[in-house]
Amino acid sequence: MTKPYVVCLMGPTASGKTGLAVELAEHHNFEIISVDSALVYKGMDIGTAKPSAELLARAPHRLIDIIDPLEFYSAADFVLDAVEQSQEILAKGKTPLLVGGTMMYFNALQKGLAEMPQADAELRVIIEAEAAEKGWAALHEELQRFDPEAASRIHPNDPQRLQRAIEVYRLTGKTMTHFWRQQEAVSLPFEMINMAVMPKERSVLHERIEQRFYDMMDQGFLAEVEGFYRRGDLTIDMPSMRCVGYRQLWQYLDGVDLLEDAIFKGVVASRQLAKRQLTWLRGWEDLMIFDSLSKDLVPEALNYIESRII
């Protein structure tokens, strides 16, 4: 490679990305940059499966705990931060290892951000009124009809992105998918090596997701959400509190669901998140996928990286 290289390690939730990243960092001259839209928030530790203090001591992660849950962090913010952090790491003679499951961030970094129309306040009021009358699920069905690819990537309980996809279509007559495909790649000062890790069997991933959610409940996830609930300045519609698990437990605290129902919905939402992440990964070009259950996972990943940089 003529340019320095950056390694991107992707994968669905609960696939073993963090464990592999820490192992790689201990065997190679890597520094880790988190690619996770939930890990940026301070105090959101249990429900995001934030790496433990022990793991962070072994392999520090950049772009973790950088903003309050009241604040907003966009894909554009991530691109700026990731490029800056990568250049800092490269200047030290080390290799950036970008690790996470927020595929939109990886996509924005590698393929650029599309030039889409500005938000239209009047149209947004109309869409919000429709949602209040019919529900966001009905608007998601509408999106499914004219842009099924975007609908597969946007959850019905993600009103911000759902509203934007409908707004863009009504303003331009073109789908969000159209704009994604028109993106202009950012001119990056480094090459990308793309890898993903996941179990070969989908059932194994589903079991991991369910077990991790129950483990998080045992670790005090409900108390963590309750702390945010009682702050008074956060709402369920903010990006931070829309994160998987937080939204469902917030609804329990609001009296909408019984706790057992909220937990069930949290597990289902986690599996749906994994499905959307896998949808992104299936269309990713030049991606090497590793089995997270392989006993030789670390040497296999290191050998692949070395084969790419020769």
UniProtKB/Swiss-Prot annotation:
GO terms for biological process: tRNA modification. The record marks 102, 124 as: Interaction with substrate tRNA. Belongs to the IPP transferase family. GO terms for molecular function: ATP binding; tRNA dimethylallyltransferase activity. Residues 36-39, 160-164, 242-247 are annotated as: Interaction with substrate tRNA. Substrate binds at residues 13-18. ATP binds at residues 11-18. Its cofactor is Mg(2+). It is an enzyme of class 2 (transferase). InterPro entries: Dimethylallyltransferase, IPT, P-loop_NTPase. It catalyses: adenosine(37) in tRNA + dimethylallyl diphosphate = N(6)-dimethylallyladenosine(37) in tRNA + diphosphate. Monomer. This is tRNA dimethylallyltransferase. Its EC number is 2.5.1.75.
